[in-house]
Structure formats: structure tokens, C-alpha cells
Amino acid sequence: MVMKKIIMTNFNCDNCGDCVKACMEKNKVGRIAIMEKDGKYIPIVCQHCASAPCKEVCPVSAIEHKDGYVYLNEDVCIGCGLCALACPFGAILMEDKAYKCILCNGDEPACVKACSKRCLELVDVNELIFAKRDKSLDLFSKMSLPTQKSDNSLISKITIDAKVKP
């Protein structure tokens, strides 16, 4: 199963609002927010958590997992706001009801398409995990192994620092 998420790929967001406008045009209501933190702007979208706190607190079961994604049934939602409070990312927006990213129902996400700074990207979660793993393995492979004679190896530094000095 291919699971996709929208992630922020750089910190070039200038709060132009193009992603929010595109989302509103496509979905009738904005499902993305832009947060400002220390002079940087960060687009906030649902991360479709595997163990979604928003789903757990919904008193009317308006939120469900399906095919690896978190869906909110706006027709069932009563607008209590508990899901918005429970979301660790602040990705559920409240008006009369709760609204969250639905990844444009499988189409290319409007926010990703509209971002002129290329801050947002739709990624395959598995590819992202494997890319991070490969990067870590590459870094480890460049470290000196304990059997190699090198004062620069990570193991050498740890053992030298750990020795008791007279």
C-alpha cells in the first residue's frame, strides 16, 4: 500500500498564502494553515497519524482510519473541537465544524501545486523512510571501524574519553 503525506521540504515559505487560497478554491474551505515561529513560516497540514489522537477523542466517531489515511466525515462532525485540541500538529481547523487535509481526494494536492517556493511536496512515506535509512547507513559506512587504525573513529574517541586518567 502506498501512503503519501505532504511535507515541508524547505524553510522558504514567505506566507504568501497561495497554498491556502488554492486549497480553499479546491475544497471550498481552507484545510491548511500557516504558522509563524521565530520569523519563519511553516505550512501545517494533517500528517495522517498511524495512531491519531483526533480519532480517539471524537465523541461521534466522525474520524476514521481508512487505507492508512485519517478521514473526517464532516456530515457527522458536531463541531465540538476536541479533535483540534488533540491534534499534535495543529492541523485540524475549526469553523462551524472541523476541517482537515484530505490530500485532495487523490488528485495532485492544490497546495503543493500552488506553492511557488516549492516548500511543500507530496511524498511516498515508504520512500522517505528508506531514503533516511540509506543516508544513515551511508554516514555509518564512512566512519572508521574499531578494527581500523585511526584516531578519528567514533569508537576510538569514545574509548579514549572513557579511559580513567591517573
From Swiss-Prot:
Kindly list the positions annotated as binding [4Fe-4S] cluster 2: C23, C101, C104, C111
The answer to keyword Iron-sulfur applying to this record is: yes
Keywords, alphabetical: 4Fe-4S, Electron transport, Iron, Iron-sulfur, Metal-binding, Repeat, Transport
| Residues in 4Fe-4S ferredoxin-type domain copies | 3-33, 37-67, 68-97
Q: Where do the annotations place [4Fe-4S] cluster 1 binding?
A: C13, C16, C19, C115
Disulfide topology = none
Residues binding [4Fe-4S] cluster 3 are C46, C49, C54, C87
Detail which positions bind [4Fe-4S] cluster 4: C58, C77, C80, C83
Cross-referenced Pfam families, in alphabetical order? Answer: Fer4_11
Provide the cofactor list for this protein.
[4Fe-4S] cluster
Keyword Oxidoreductase (UniProt): no
Q: What is this protein called?
A: Uncharacterized ferredoxin MJ0265
Q: Which organism is it from?
A: Methanocaldococcus jannaschii (strain ATCC 43067 / DSM 2661 / JAL-1 / JCM 10045 / NBRC 100440) (Methanococcus jannaschii)
What taxonomic ancestry is recorded?
A: Archaea, Methanobacteriati, Methanobacteriota, Methanomada group, Methanococci
